[in-house]
């Protein structure tokens, strides 16, 4: 299958090239960029060898359609919407790594992404409704038949995977869910930003986006769908002075306070028994971001505080892989009829 990587020189694009360049099931048939168009891949990234198709082209719907069956859109929020309809009309399937199609309502996207909405005058509510949310653990059948897939954000991925087994079975209350997440700086993208300068974020830990972080509404949308009830939760992200990795600690109230840590671990393990990239750790073993770095795995742990009937869920992912591009490749595999983790059998070179 021929794959176009659009936005090839951002972190999402770089990871996509790395994951697909040696995969015999796919051919990277097109590399597209804005600022880097007209340059060679090897000039930008001499340490990542491509045997062919070394030129980064100007982004063009016609060129993508001529050369690719599927387009991975690794672009800033808002830009994907300027390409998607044209690509779909020409028969190109789209896997979008931005937030443009994560919401079922265009109006909601416009409210949450108001700055982008002011810049990009969208009129594609029909595509928002059509897009399939690309979390394979809950949508693998719909993903396999989709022509437009919206890859989840990194924070929602790290929060929803541990929550879904308990929300879907009504094991935890819909109220009082708290998500405390920490991310490496690569989650902010490759564009320069003062807060991501080493002298600004090094040797420090800081929260940001309290109450109104964009991923709050994304998590709430999917959590509400899974539980069948409207859910409002508290989500606080933090910036860690490391390059890649994400750690989420999630708190909830058990409806049956008699459940133990072992009971809840079994619930997690049974729910994800068919997903080899999801590892449920033994009780009292708590995951480290270092364990999943450079892999598409997610490690989960659970502990119950029987004094107050609370459950504590822990998850770690590599924010650039399971939190972004690795998940996009899982979606690509599903629409290609291939095993979910094809090409994602990566080894963590610990330490």
Curated annotation (Swiss-Prot):
<keyword id="KW-0560">Oxidoreductase</keyword>
<dbReference type="GO" id="GO:0070401">
    <property type="term" value="F:NADP+ binding"/>
</dbReference>
<dbReference type="GO" id="GO:0005737">
    <property type="term" value="C:cytoplasm"/>
</dbReference>
<feature type="active site">
    <location>
        <position position="154"/>
    </location>
</feature>
<dbReference type="Pfam" id="PF22698">
    <property type="entry name" value="Semialdhyde_dhC_1"/>
</dbReference>
<dbReference type="InterPro" id="IPR000706">
    <property type="entry name" value="AGPR_type-1"/>
</dbReference>
<dbReference type="GO" id="GO:0003942">
    <property type="term" value="F:N-acetyl-gamma-glutamyl-phosphate reductase activity"/>
</dbReference>
<keyword id="KW-0963">Cytoplasm</keyword>
<protein>
    <recommendedName>
        <fullName>N-acetyl-gamma-glutamyl-phosphate reductase</fullName>
        <ecNumber>1.2.1.38</ecNumber>
    </recommendedName>
</protein>
<keyword id="KW-0055">Arginine biosynthesis</keyword>
<dbReference type="GO" id="GO:0006526">
    <property type="term" value="P:L-arginine biosynthetic process"/>
</dbReference>
<comment type="pathway">
    <text>Amino-acid biosynthesis; L-arginine biosynthesis; N(2)-acetyl-L-ornithine from L-glutamate: step 3/4.</text>
</comment>
<dbReference type="InterPro" id="IPR036291">
    <property type="entry name" value="NAD(P)-bd_dom_sf"/>
</dbReference>
<dbReference type="InterPro" id="IPR000534">
    <property type="entry name" value="Semialdehyde_DH_NAD-bd"/>
</dbReference>
<keyword id="KW-0028">Amino-acid biosynthesis</keyword>
<dbReference type="InterPro" id="IPR050085">
    <property type="entry name" value="NAGSA_dehydrogenase"/>
</dbReference>
<comment type="similarity">
    <text>Belongs to the NAGSA dehydrogenase family. Type 1 subfamily.</text>
</comment>
<dbReference type="InterPro" id="IPR023013">
    <property type="entry name" value="AGPR_AS"/>
</dbReference>
<dbReference type="GO" id="GO:0051287">
    <property type="term" value="F:NAD binding"/>
</dbReference>
<comment type="function">
    <text>Catalyzes the NADPH-dependent reduction of N-acetyl-5-glutamyl phosphate to yield N-acetyl-L-glutamate 5-semialdehyde.</text>
</comment>
<dbReference type="Pfam" id="PF01118">
    <property type="entry name" value="Semialdhyde_dh"/>
</dbReference>
<keyword id="KW-0521">NADP</keyword>
